[in-house]
Regions:
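Conserved SAM-binding loop of SAM-dependent methyltransferases across substrates and taxa
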Residues: 40-52
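A conserved beta-strand element that flanks and buttresses the S-adenosyl-L-methionine
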Residues: 113-114
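A short, conserved alpha-helix within the catalytic core of class I
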Residues: 121-134
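Conserved beta-strand signature within the Rossmann-like core of class I S-adenosyl-L-methionine
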Residues: 138-151
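Conserved class I S-adenosyl-L-methionine
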Residues: 29-40
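S-adenosyl-L-methionine
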Residues: 71-107
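Conserved Class I S-adenosyl-L-methionine-dependent methyltransferase catalytic core
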Residues: 1-28
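Rossmann-like AdoMet/SAM-dependent catalytic core
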Residues: 163-210
Length: 210
């Protein structure tokens, strides 16, 4: 209501994601969540609402990051919202915003990383840079990833979920087709439509770099 956004499929998908994390990782209240590519801040706001002591870090393309900021600040105007552009800036205990173009230059520390439906839009070098960040944490770290198994980018490259830089040392907690990411509702019979290709989701305890 505070965000002036109607409840839609994306909202339902985010609720199911948070429910899964809460079920599989029952220790979330004071954790830091880093969301790679939220879009409208809806997942971050949902996490903050359910886990008030949590810290939220958004990483998004510069222009899209403005939407994360706009809607998160609308829902939580009384909390701190910091734009982080260098390692010289302190992180807020509430909401933090990092431009994707700068993420490799900033020492981002998080307990749980989340990526929904945006790694499928990246080339492998960018995906590799995010995995490098995730694997170079200094304490126990988890990563939830839900993306299309295979997608052809405009330049002709095909990005495959199973070719992301996973490790055999990652501990699999959830791994399979995502039940809520195979089809979406429409307002005419049969009242759903298949998404463009199957979507896999995976929750891991990350094998960190030694």
């Amino acid at each position: 209501k505070k965000s002036s956004r109607l409840f839609d499929y994306d909202c339902a998908r985010n609720i199911l994601t948070v429910n899964l994390l809460n079920e599989k990782l029952p220790f979330l209240d004071e954790k830091t969540f880093c969301i790679i590519g939220d879009g409208y801040g809806s997942l971050g706001c949902l996490l903050k609402k359910n886990f008030p002591k949590s810290k939220i870090i958004y990483i998004n393309l510069g222009r899209t990051l403005l939407f994360d900021l706009h809607y998160s600040k609308k829902v939580f105007p009384e909390l701190d919202h910091y734009l982080i552009r260098s390692n010289n800036q302190p992180f807020s205990k509430d909401f933090n915003y990092v431009e994707a173009e700068l993420h490799k230059n900033i020492n981002i520390k998080s307990d749980i990383f989340i990526n929904n439906h945006s790694m499928q839009e990246m080339d492998y070098e960018v995906i590799k840079s995010y995995f490098f960040m995730i694997r170079n944490q200094t304490k126990d770290t988890w990563f939830y990833c839900c993306n299309r198994i295979s997608k052809k980018l405009p330049d002709g490259k095909v990005i495959n979920f199973f070719k992301y830089p996973w490790s055999k040392e990652d501990h699999l907690i959830v791994n399979g087709l995502c039940p809520w990411a195979q089809r979406f509702p429409i307002n005419m019979p049969p009242f759903y439509r298949d998404l463009d290709g199957p979507h896999q989701h995976r929750l891991i305890k990350v094998a960190l770099e030694k």
